[in-house]
UniProtKB/Swiss-Prot annotation:
This is 3-dehydroshikimate dehydratase. Changing residue 70 to A: Binds substrate with 10-fold lower affinity. Pfam families: AP_endonuc_2. It comes from the Bacteria. The gene is asbF. Signal peptide: none annotated. Gene3D superfamilies: Divalent-metal-dependent TIM barrel enzymes. Substrate binds at residues 70, 102, 142, 172, 175, 217, 253. InterPro entries: IolE/XylAMocC-like, Xyl_isomerase-like_sf, Xyl_isomerase-like_TIM-brl.
C-alpha cells in the first residue's frame, strides 16, 4: 500500500500545485489525489506550468492517483450534460496520466430509493462505466452516507446490478464504519472491486455530521472532532494491518485545519509504524 494526499485538503488555502507536489515529495507521499475542480482549473488556466510539473512527477516517484469529482446521476439531472462532463474528465485523466475517476452513487440514502428509481440509477452508472471503459479508465464509487453505497449490503448489491468490469470501489473506512459495518470485514467482502482507500478519523460518532458536504466544503465550517488517524474512534492499526500488503493507494483525506502540519505528522507516524512492523 502507498499513501497519497488530497488536494482538497488545501481547498481553502492559497497554495500552488507546484508547492503541493514539493510538499508531497518531501514528506514521503507517493501519490496525489486531485479534486476535480482543481484538475479542471490546472488544465484551463495553468496548462504550461502544470505540464512541466507533471513531467517531473516520475523523478520524484510521484503520480496522480485519481481525479475525485461528482457526476450527477439523479433523475432530475440533464444526463447529457453528465455525459459531457464524463468526456471532459476522460481528457483530464489522460493528461494527468491516471485511469481512475471517483464519484458518488447518487445523493440520497439507499433506503429512500424505490426499486424503479434504483434501476434507473443502475442504468446510468453502467452507461458512465461504458464511456470510461472506452478510455481504459475506471469509475470508483465511494462508500458514503446518503448514496446507494451507504451500507455494505447496498454496495454489494449495486456492484452486482451494474455488473460492469470498469466499476470499482473507493473504500472510505470511516464512512463504512459509520454505516454500522465492520471495516475489516467490509474490506474483505469488497476486496475484488476495491481500487483505492480513503483514510480519515473522528474523535466520536457524535461529530460525524462535520463530514456532511455543506459543512466540509464551507471555509467557515465546523471542524470539531476531526482528528489524526490514530487518535480517533476507528481502529486504523487493525485496518492497516489488513490492507498494507495490497497494491492500492490510501489517501489521507484531511478536511481540518493546518493541513500541512497534520499531513506531515501523519506520514511520520505511518512511516514509524511501518518500520516497527518490518523489524519486529
Amino acid at each position: 500500500m502507498k499513501y497519497s494526499l488530497c488536494t482538497i485538503s488545501f481547498r481553502h488555502q492559497l497554495i500552488s500545485f507546484t508547492d503541493i507536489v514539493q510538499f508531497a515529495y518531501e514528506n514521503g507521499f507517493e501519490g496525489i489525489e486531485l479534486w476535480g475542480t482543481h484538475a479542471q482549473n490546472l488544465y484551463m488556466q495553468e496548462y504550461e506550468t502544470t505540464e512541466r510539473e507533471l513531467n517531473c512527477l516520475k523523478d520524484k516517484t510521484l503520480e496522480i492517483t485519481m481525479i475525485s469529482d461528482y457526476l450527477d446521476i439523479s433523475l432530475s439531472a440533464d444526463f447529457e450534460k453528465t455525459i459531457e462532463k464524463c468526456e471532459q474528465l476522460a481528457i483530464l485523466a489522460n493528461w494527468f496520466k491516471t485511469n481512475k475517476i471517483r464519484t458518488f452513487a447518487g445523493q440520497k440514502g439507499s433506503a429512500d430509493f424505490s426499486q424503479q428509481e434504483r434501476q434507473e440509477y443502475v442504468n446510468r452508472i453502467r452507461m458512465i462505466c461504458e464511456l470510461f471503459a472506452q478510455h481504459n479508465m475506471y469509475v470508483l464509487l465511494e462508500t458514503h452516507p446518503n448514496t446507494l453505497t451507504d451500507t455494505l449490503p447496498s454496495t454489494l448489491e449495486l456492484l452486482g446490478e451494474v455488473d460492469h468490469p470498469n466499476l470499482k470501489i473507493n473504500l472510505d473506512f470511516l464512512h463504512i464504519w459509520e454505516s454500522g459495518a465492520d471495516p475489516v470485514d467490509s474490506f474483505q467482502q469488497l476486496r475484488p472491486w476495491i481500487q483505492h482507500y480513503h483514510f480519515k478519523n473522528i474523535s466520536s460518532a457524535d461529530y460525524l455530521h462535520v463530514f456532511e458536504p455543506n459543512n466540509v466544503y464551507a471555509a467557515a465550517g465546523n471542524r470539531t472532532g476531526m482528528v489524526p488517524l490514530f487518535e480517533g474512534i476507528v481502529n486504523y492499526d487493525e485496518i492497516i494491518q489488513e490492507v498494507r500488503d495490497t497494491d492500492h493507494f490510501a489517501s489521507l483525506e484531511w478536511f481540518g485545519h493546518n493541513a500541512k502540519d497534520i499531513l506531515k505528522a501523519e506520514m511520520k507516524v505511518l512511516t514509524n509504524r511501518n518500520l516497527e512492523v518490518v523489524t519486529s
